[in-house]
Amino acid sequence: MKFFLRHVILIVSFSSIAQTFTNPILSGAYPDPSICVVDGDFYLVNSSFEYFPGLPIHKSKDLVNWELIGYGLDRENQCNGTNNLVDVQSNGGIHAPTIRYHEGIFYIITTNIYSPVKGPTQFINFIITAEDPAGSWSEPHIIEGAPGIDPDLFFDDDGKVWFVGTHDKGDKNANGIGELWVQELDLTKWQLKGERTSVWTGACGGCCLEGPHMYKREGTYYLMAAEGGTSFNHAVMIAASDKITGPYDSNPRNP
């Protein structure tokens, strides 16, 4: 009987733990999540592709219960002109945003993929800002000369701001055998500056290298990215370096 009761108690205990949350924590179309935390509140942004309003923003205090508080793109004048969402294709639009917070300002950096009827596919990397993540958000600041997709924005502790990007080694606007690159970014002019440095080709030959995110902990830079495409070979890789411009050492346990 004691054996039975002990196991019943354990089962009930584990059941209680399991019922505290269920995956997915957000049901529906919320791919490519990016999160930042400010004063104990978590803010989440996701890809929205061709849909409008775009860039849904959720807020949570526990990473389990989320409230939709607004959209990064909710005005027509944010989505026409260079940053065109008016007639974007069903496989285009807003991909893999990153949300960051620095000195009182929220930033979202992302790519709009647009394929005109005539001409090559365009990869438009841009940033929007807000003091309140619920909105309103600024007009898009287009980062000219930034190739590739899925950019990250990194604020270093020396005051420098870095654009972390990806591009194809052969065609800088394709998504084949890729590499990751970093370049300093001037947020007063919304322009890249200085030298662009290719820093890593991933752990599996750079196939479909995408979604980079830069972190820094105890003086070491950690560069995380996805690789292998979006099917069975999709995997997460990470590498480390003492300098943001590399060289980066791939984790031997990748992928």
Predicted features, each with a name:
Residues 18-255:
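Carbohydrate-active catalytic/glycan-binding domains of CAZyme proteins
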